[in-house]
Amino acid sequence: MPGLAEAMPEISPDGTTYKLKLRKNMKYSDGTPIKASDFTYAVQRLFKADSGGSVFYDVIVGAKEYADGKADTITGITTDDNTGDITIKLTGPNGTFENLLALMFSAPVPPTTKLDGDTTNTPPPASGPFMISNVDAPRTMTMERNPQFKTVKDAGASEVADANVDKITVVENKNQSAQVTDIVQNKVDFMVDPVPSDRLQEVKTRYADRFRMEESINTYYFFMNTQKAPFNDIKVRQAINYAVDPEALNRIFGGRLLPTQQVLPPGMPGYQEYKLYPGPDMNKAKQLIAEANPADRDITVWTDDEPDRKRIGEYYHDLLTQLGFNATLKVIAGDVYWTTIGNQSTPDVDTGFADWFQDFPHPDDFFRPLLNGASILPTNGNNLSRANLPELDAKMNELLTKQITDPGVEQQYADLDKAYMEQAVWAPYGNEQFTTFLSERMDFDKSYQHLLFKQDFTSFAVK
């Protein structure tokens, strides 16, 4: 639905030009007027800050030239601050672009926002129902009702929900069991993390009136660096897929992990269940390792220090050891995990824990940022397996020019899924379910967890 824009984008018949009009007289939380040119600035920031989201927007005419420092602006975006008109020209038709315009990556920000620096502790002003009023990363963050959100509502964004509470304080606590105890004792109102496996049955049984399971569209997998030994050998990668036991990993999650062996998760267009590597089959896995006979058997296994993820890493480390590798487990802090393993200068990023949650409801979101060769970035990369398969990239690019509703497109995405798994670029093992658990003072029935954006903070309400 339209938010800051007056209506959904007007798309040219050839699918290469998108036109929008910004609503009039809207302001950011600090009182700065929201201008059409702020959209251009927001997209430019993605490339200057090496954002992992930049890969979505390189389909805009001139984006690559701007990213390479060959242009001062992105020529495919033109705006008029007087009329609010925004025109975006693409290099070709793109079946996902309407979704991309709704992502937080492209949310307008004023030009006073740092172009190429970290804004964690100095967040830009907000245009939504809440603003970030204080940050002490990574310990605390405070969100308060945006005093200027009325200008957005008055401009016509009537369908965008307003906040029910005046203030939300977020406090870091990596001990998930302690989080549960705090909610039970009504010291905390909500936990972002799912209820841990060792407390799940207790919470389900004793606090059923304020607990529920939540569906989520995601895939958990082990990445394998396909550009260096031993994972540059497909037989080694296939062996890992045969050896991994999704049910063993499900036990780590307390039964919240639905087993899988593919890229696309249930609920995503193009999903068709299949299993190329029936198992777990350690005999088959060891046979493939013997056939590959890798000369380099020294492997560093990466994971972060969140309890479930650490246990996943320990499981994977033990599995690789059983397969005859000299595996070293490297556990690092969760708040730097993705930037560390997504940096090509980080040594020994061989294999490890990874997951991906949908950015938007289109299968390209599970292929382009994670498996396209163009997504192998120097920093903030999400193609952790360094997959670079030109034939499959070409198919991915071809599908991008079509709409997901076009005849046969969903089937082609299902075929693309299988083609990547025939190359065993990942070892997927599960799709996680989440939880909502609230304190007694919260209105449980009003609380809403969005399938895409997770907890809707505007739905929080005190009884």
Can you name each region flagged by the protein language model?
Residues 95-101, 291-308, 348-355, 402-440:
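Bilobed periplasmic-binding protein-like "clamshell/Venus-flytrap" ligand-binding domains
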Residues 1-13, 63-66, 103-134, 148, ...:
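Short, solvent-exposed loop/beta-turn-alpha elements that line the ligand-binding surface or hinge
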Residues 144, 232-323, 328, 386, ...:
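Append "and occasionally in soluble cytosolic enzymes with long acidic Gly/Pro-rich linkers
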Residues 19-21, 33, 38-40, 48, ...:
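Surface-exposed binding/hinge segments that line
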Residues 35-42, 83-87, 128-129, 162-167, ...:
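Alpha-helical secondary-structure segments
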Residues 31-32, 38, 177-189, 206, ...:
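Short helices/loops that flank or line small-molecule/ion binding pockets
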